Amino acid sequence: MQFRFLLLAEGWRDSVLGAPRRLLVTLGSLSRDSSPCPAAKEEALPSLPVPDLETTLQKYLAQVEAVAPNHLERTRSLVRAFLSGPGPKLQQRLLERRQKTTNWATEWWLNDMYLSCPLALPINSNPGLAAKPKRFANQQEAAVFLARFLTELLNYQELLDRHGLEVERMKSKDGKTMQSLCMAQHYQMFRIYRRPGVNSDEQIILDRASSGDHIIVAHHNQFYNVPVRASDRGRITENELTQQLLRIMETKADPRTPPVGILTTAKRPAWAKAREELVKSERNRHNLELLERCLCVICIDDDVLPTTFNNPIRKEDRWIGDRDYANVLHHALHGGGSRHLGANRWFDKTVHAILGKTEDF
């Protein structure tokens, strides 16, 4: 209760940076449109096929035999009853659904495997990876590197905005022809957000007009709004980005700052209830909206996970050369939890880039 009181009473500190005025007022409504983007429709893509019922049931029995052989005979009896009972009617409903949707399984898969799962996002859902080590002599070099990274990221975003990404293809089953792949996931990666819900999360897909003009930088568990486009002249320069990042890097930790990012590591219903309290404050509601609409989150960590974090794991199982990759991946996946760097994240946002104290990125 004390943490929540401090958060609601004090709100979040304003960014030390100036932002275009239009970012400081309520922007347009969030879109919940889950239809494929126009670029995904440029080439005719086949609808996801519905396997015939007998094939589906035979595959199901084969899996039961592999994982629960003691239940195989009982399952066979249930399968026979299903095949002679409601099975054909449900199969027909699937075939009808296929005629009305681009992919009949997407909505169910998304809700069942992800949005309805109450588990915390770190480890259970969110992936992570480690880039090649990049050593910096000082903060200036690190800021220049991050600014260059963001510049290239913005270039890629603009490529997506003009639908300029080449359609990917893979060999068809016959091994002779090439099948075009749906590119919707690429076009949504910067414009998608996972909002917590008590019963189920909500996937927010933003339109181009209301997102992508700013990034969020996390440092010392505090979140800064950094504009990447100005209302009067378009994209800011790489040097301007460097200077803004440097100013954030030079800020000192404030023990009074509530580690609000740790809420995104909680089980989803708990985070959803906490969010309901947060949005009662207009200031917190505005800041949450900025987080939802940002292009990405850049996490600048002034620490690393201690070498004892993975002490039970043998060194030969976690080191490659002079790098502890087990620790690096823990750093990327969850930041070590509340005792370490886990609050310097916002796990609901799709794209994170994490800069460690040493060479980790």
Language model features by range: what are they?
Residues 2-348, 355-358:
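Long, Pro/Ser/Thr-rich low-complexity/intrinsically disordered regulatory tracts in eukaryotic proteins
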Residues 361:
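Classical protein tyrosine phosphatase
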